[in-house]
Protein backbone atom coordinates (compact mmCIF):
# COMPACT_ATOMS: atom_id res chain seq x y z
CA UNK A 1 0.00 0.00 0.00
CA UNK A 2 1.33 3.41 -0.93
CA UNK A 3 2.03 6.09 1.66
CA UNK A 4 -0.57 8.88 1.51
CA UNK A 5 1.05 12.31 1.18
CA UNK A 6 -0.20 15.90 1.05
CA UNK A 7 2.07 18.50 -0.54
CA UNK A 8 1.41 21.90 1.01
CA UNK A 9 2.68 24.72 -1.17
CA UNK A 10 2.16 22.62 -4.27
CA UNK A 11 1.97 25.60 -6.64
CA UNK A 12 5.45 26.93 -5.86
CA UNK A 13 8.58 26.00 -7.78
CA UNK A 14 9.68 23.50 -5.14
CA UNK A 15 6.14 22.23 -4.68
CA UNK A 16 5.64 21.51 -8.38
CA UNK A 17 8.87 19.51 -8.53
CA UNK A 18 8.06 17.67 -5.30
CA UNK A 19 4.65 16.65 -6.65
CA UNK A 20 6.21 15.42 -9.88
CA UNK A 21 8.86 13.44 -8.00
CA UNK A 22 6.54 11.85 -5.45
CA UNK A 23 3.84 11.05 -8.04
CA UNK A 24 6.39 9.08 -10.04
CA UNK A 25 7.60 7.10 -7.01
CA UNK A 26 6.11 3.67 -6.44
CA UNK A 27 5.99 4.06 -2.65
CA UNK A 28 3.90 7.23 -2.55
CA UNK A 29 0.43 8.52 -3.42
CA UNK A 30 -0.30 12.24 -3.41
CA UNK A 31 -3.79 12.64 -1.99
CA UNK A 32 -3.91 16.46 -2.05
CA UNK A 33 -2.00 19.40 -3.50
CA UNK A 34 -2.66 22.44 -1.36
CA UNK A 35 -2.03 26.16 -1.63
CA UNK A 36 -2.47 29.06 0.78
CA UNK A 37 -6.26 29.29 0.50
CA UNK A 38 -6.87 25.60 1.29
CA UNK A 39 -7.76 24.25 4.74
CA UNK A 40 -4.78 22.12 5.75
CA UNK A 41 -6.32 20.53 8.83
CA UNK A 42 -9.53 19.55 7.05
CA UNK A 43 -7.57 18.14 4.12
CA UNK A 44 -5.58 15.89 6.47
CA UNK A 45 -8.82 14.56 7.96
CA UNK A 46 -10.56 14.14 4.60
CA UNK A 47 -7.68 12.33 2.89
CA UNK A 48 -6.33 10.42 5.91
CA UNK A 49 -2.88 11.64 4.91
CA UNK A 50 0.05 10.04 6.69
CA UNK A 51 2.63 12.67 5.73
CA UNK A 52 2.45 16.37 4.90
CA UNK A 53 5.37 17.84 2.97
CA UNK A 54 5.34 21.57 3.75
CA UNK A 55 7.01 23.81 1.16
CA UNK A 56 5.27 27.08 1.95
CA UNK A 57 6.57 30.31 3.50
CA UNK A 58 8.39 31.41 6.62
CA UNK A 59 5.39 33.42 7.83
CA UNK A 60 3.10 30.38 8.07
CA UNK A 61 5.38 27.36 8.55
CA UNK A 62 5.05 27.25 12.35
CA UNK A 63 1.25 27.29 12.30
CA UNK A 64 1.26 24.71 9.51
CA UNK A 65 3.54 22.45 11.54
CA UNK A 66 1.26 22.66 14.57
CA UNK A 67 -1.76 21.83 12.40
CA UNK A 68 -0.05 18.82 10.83
CA UNK A 69 1.00 17.31 14.16
CA UNK A 70 -2.29 18.06 15.94
CA UNK A 71 -4.20 16.33 13.13
CA UNK A 72 -2.12 13.16 13.40
CA UNK A 73 0.00 13.43 10.26
CA UNK A 74 3.79 13.42 10.11
CA UNK A 75 5.43 16.69 9.09
CA UNK A 76 8.25 16.86 6.56
CA UNK A 77 9.13 20.54 6.75
CA UNK A 78 11.23 22.03 3.98
CA UNK A 79 10.28 25.63 4.70
CA UNK A 80 12.83 27.80 6.50
CA UNK A 81 11.94 30.45 9.05
CA UNK A 82 11.46 28.38 12.20
CA UNK A 83 13.38 29.76 15.19
CA UNK A 84 14.88 27.64 17.97
CA UNK A 85 12.03 28.19 20.42
CA UNK A 86 9.49 27.07 17.80
CA UNK A 87 11.54 23.98 16.96
CA UNK A 88 11.67 23.15 20.68
CA UNK A 89 7.88 23.48 20.96
CA UNK A 90 7.30 21.27 17.92
CA UNK A 91 9.75 18.70 19.31
CA UNK A 92 7.81 18.57 22.59
CA UNK A 93 4.50 18.25 20.76
CA UNK A 94 5.78 15.32 18.68
CA UNK A 95 6.97 13.63 21.88
CA UNK A 96 3.55 14.04 23.46
CA UNK A 97 1.75 12.78 20.34
CA UNK A 98 4.38 10.07 19.64
CA UNK A 99 4.53 11.31 16.06
CA UNK A 100 7.66 11.33 13.95
CA UNK A 101 8.59 14.36 11.92
CA UNK A 102 11.46 15.97 10.04
CA UNK A 103 12.53 19.60 9.80
CA UNK A 104 15.07 19.85 6.99
CA UNK A 105 16.82 23.22 6.60
CA UNK A 106 18.15 21.77 3.34
CA UNK A 107 17.13 18.67 1.34
CA UNK A 108 20.27 18.68 -0.81
CA UNK A 109 22.59 15.80 0.01
CA UNK A 110 25.56 17.91 -1.08
CA UNK A 111 24.56 20.68 1.32
CA UNK A 112 24.27 18.17 4.15
CA UNK A 113 27.77 16.90 3.42
CA UNK A 114 29.01 20.51 3.38
CA UNK A 115 27.58 20.98 6.87
CA UNK A 116 29.11 17.74 8.13
CA UNK A 117 32.54 18.64 6.71
CA UNK A 118 32.33 22.12 8.22
CA UNK A 119 31.50 20.61 11.60
CA UNK A 120 34.59 18.42 11.39
CA UNK A 121 36.79 21.34 10.35
CA UNK A 122 35.55 23.39 13.31
CA UNK A 123 37.39 21.02 15.65
CA UNK A 124 40.64 22.48 14.28
CA UNK A 125 39.67 26.04 13.24
CA UNK A 126 37.99 28.28 15.81
CA UNK A 127 37.68 31.26 13.45
CA UNK A 128 34.81 30.84 10.99
CA UNK A 129 32.19 32.86 9.16
CA UNK A 130 29.32 31.82 6.90
CA UNK A 131 28.33 33.50 3.63
CA UNK A 132 25.01 32.36 2.19
CA UNK A 133 23.30 33.52 -0.97
CA UNK A 134 19.84 32.93 -2.41
CA UNK A 135 17.45 34.20 -5.06
CA UNK A 136 15.59 37.41 -4.30
CA UNK A 137 12.26 35.66 -3.75
CA UNK A 138 13.58 34.16 -0.51
CA UNK A 139 12.23 36.55 2.08
CA UNK A 140 13.87 35.25 5.28
CA UNK A 141 17.51 35.79 6.19
CA UNK A 142 19.74 34.18 7.15
CA UNK A 143 18.77 30.87 5.59
CA UNK A 144 17.81 27.85 7.65
CA UNK A 145 20.86 26.09 6.27
CA UNK A 146 23.17 28.83 7.56
CA UNK A 147 21.55 28.78 10.99
CA UNK A 148 21.79 25.01 11.22
CA UNK A 149 25.42 25.08 10.07
CA UNK A 150 26.27 27.63 12.76
CA UNK A 151 24.58 25.49 15.41
CA UNK A 152 26.49 22.38 14.33
CA UNK A 153 29.81 24.23 14.29
CA UNK A 154 29.19 25.84 17.68
CA UNK A 155 28.47 22.45 19.22
CA UNK A 156 31.64 20.90 17.80
CA UNK A 157 34.37 23.52 18.09
CA UNK A 158 36.77 23.13 20.97
CA UNK A 159 37.67 26.75 21.74
CA UNK A 160 35.88 30.09 21.39
CA UNK A 161 36.68 32.48 18.59
CA UNK A 162 38.84 35.55 19.11
CA UNK A 163 37.06 38.65 20.38
CA UNK A 164 38.05 41.50 18.08
CA UNK A 165 37.68 45.15 19.19
CA UNK A 166 36.06 46.24 15.93
CA UNK A 167 33.85 49.24 15.30
CA UNK A 168 31.31 48.97 12.49
CA UNK A 169 31.38 52.16 10.46
CA UNK A 170 28.23 50.95 8.73
CA UNK A 171 25.82 49.06 11.03
CA UNK A 172 25.55 45.41 10.03
CA UNK A 173 28.81 45.39 8.07
CA UNK A 174 30.00 42.33 9.99
CA UNK A 175 26.78 40.43 9.39
CA UNK A 176 24.46 38.87 11.93
CA UNK A 177 25.60 36.57 14.73
CA UNK A 178 24.15 33.16 15.56
CA UNK A 179 25.80 31.08 18.27
CA UNK A 180 28.70 33.56 18.12
CA UNK A 181 29.27 32.87 14.41
CA UNK A 182 28.92 35.71 11.90
CA UNK A 183 26.55 35.05 9.00
CA UNK A 184 26.38 37.20 5.86
CA UNK A 185 23.31 36.90 3.62
CA UNK A 186 23.21 37.72 -0.10
CA UNK A 187 19.98 38.04 -2.11
CA UNK A 188 20.75 38.38 -5.82
CA UNK A 189 19.26 37.49 -9.20
CA UNK A 190 21.13 34.59 -10.77
CA UNK A 191 21.48 32.73 -7.47
CA UNK A 192 19.42 29.73 -6.42
CA UNK A 193 21.15 28.63 -3.21
CA UNK A 194 24.79 28.93 -2.27
CA UNK A 195 26.72 28.67 0.98
CA UNK A 196 30.39 29.08 1.82
CA UNK A 197 31.82 28.25 5.24
CA UNK A 198 35.13 30.10 5.50
CA UNK A 199 37.64 29.12 8.20
CA UNK A 200 40.78 31.08 9.05
CA UNK A 201 43.96 30.15 10.87
CA UNK A 202 47.45 31.63 11.06
CA UNK A 203 48.75 31.72 7.50
CA UNK A 204 45.86 29.80 5.90
CA UNK A 205 42.16 29.69 5.12
CA UNK A 206 39.86 26.78 4.41
CA UNK A 207 36.72 27.24 2.32
CA UNK A 208 33.90 24.70 2.10
CA UNK A 209 31.34 25.73 -0.52
CA UNK A 210 28.14 24.22 -1.86
CA UNK A 211 26.11 25.51 -4.82
CA UNK A 212 22.60 24.42 -5.75
CA UNK A 213 22.08 25.24 -9.42
CA UNK A 214 18.81 23.35 -10.00
CA UNK A 215 15.98 22.65 -7.57
CA UNK A 216 16.05 19.02 -8.63
CA UNK A 217 19.01 18.56 -6.29
CA UNK A 218 16.53 18.75 -3.40
CA UNK A 219 14.29 15.91 -4.62
CA UNK A 220 16.35 12.89 -3.39
CA UNK A 221 16.29 14.42 0.09
CA UNK A 222 12.51 14.84 0.02
CA UNK A 223 12.12 11.20 -1.04
CA UNK A 224 14.50 10.08 1.73
CA UNK A 225 12.61 12.09 4.35
CA UNK A 226 9.26 10.64 3.28
CA UNK A 227 10.69 7.13 3.39
CA UNK A 228 12.19 7.55 6.86
CA UNK A 229 9.61 9.62 8.70
CA UNK A 230 7.09 6.80 9.17
CA UNK A 231 9.67 4.91 11.23
CA UNK A 232 10.25 7.81 13.63
CA UNK A 233 8.41 8.60 16.85
CA UNK A 234 10.14 11.93 17.45
CA UNK A 235 10.94 15.13 15.57
CA UNK A 236 14.31 15.17 13.80
CA UNK A 237 15.98 18.51 13.01
CA UNK A 238 18.32 18.07 10.05
CA UNK A 239 18.51 15.54 7.26
CA UNK A 240 22.02 14.54 8.38
CA UNK A 241 20.43 12.36 11.08
CA UNK A 242 18.83 10.18 8.39
CA UNK A 243 21.89 9.50 6.24
UniProtKB/Swiss-Prot annotation:
GO-annotated molecular function: 4-hydroxy-tetrahydrodipicolinate reductase; NAD binding; NADP binding; oxidoreductase activity, acting on CH or CH2 groups, NAD or NADP as acceptor
Binding site for (S)-2,3,4,5-tetrahydrodipicolinate: 135, 144-145
Associated pathway: Amino-acid biosynthesis; L-lysine biosynthesis via DAP pathway; (S)-tetrahydrodipicolinate from L-aspartate: step 4/4
Catalyzed reactions: (S)-2,3,4,5-tetrahydrodipicolinate + NAD(+) + H2O = (2S,4S)-4-hydroxy-2,3,4,5-tetrahydrodipicolinate + NADH + H(+); (S)-2,3,4,5-tetrahydrodipicolinate + NADP(+) + H2O = (2S,4S)-4-hydroxy-2,3,4,5-tetrahydrodipicolinate + NADPH + H(+)
Residues reported to bind NAD(+): 9-14, 78-80, 104-107
Its job: Catalyzes the conversion of 4-hydroxy-tetrahydrodipicolinate (HTPA) to tetrahydrodipicolinate.
CDD domains: DHDPR_N
GO-annotated cellular components: cytosol
Name by which UniProt lists this protein: 4-hydroxy-tetrahydrodipicolinate reductase
Entry keyword annotation includes Oxidoreductase: yes
Enzyme superclass (EC): oxidoreductase
InterPro entries for this protein: DapB_C, DapB_N, DapB_N_CS, DHDPR_bac, NAD(P)-bd_dom_sf
Enzyme Commission number(s) from the entry: 1.17.1.8
Main location: cytoplasm
Catalytic residue list: 134, 138
Compartment(s) of residence: Cytoplasm
NCBIfam families: dapB
Keyword Repeat part of the UniProt annotation: no
Pfam families (alphabetical): DapB_C, DapB_N
One GO BP annotation of this record: diaminopimelate biosynthetic process
Assigned protein family: Belongs to the DapB family.
Keywords: Amino-acid biosynthesis, Cytoplasm, Diaminopimelate biosynthesis, Lysine biosynthesis, NAD, NADP, Oxidoreductase
Amino acid sequence: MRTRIIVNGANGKMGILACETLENHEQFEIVAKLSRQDNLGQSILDTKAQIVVDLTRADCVYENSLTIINHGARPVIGTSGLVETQIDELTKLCEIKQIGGIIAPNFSLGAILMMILATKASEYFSEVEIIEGHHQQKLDAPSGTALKTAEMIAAARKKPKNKLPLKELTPGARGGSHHDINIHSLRLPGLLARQEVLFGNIGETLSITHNSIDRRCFMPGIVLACQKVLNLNNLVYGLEHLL
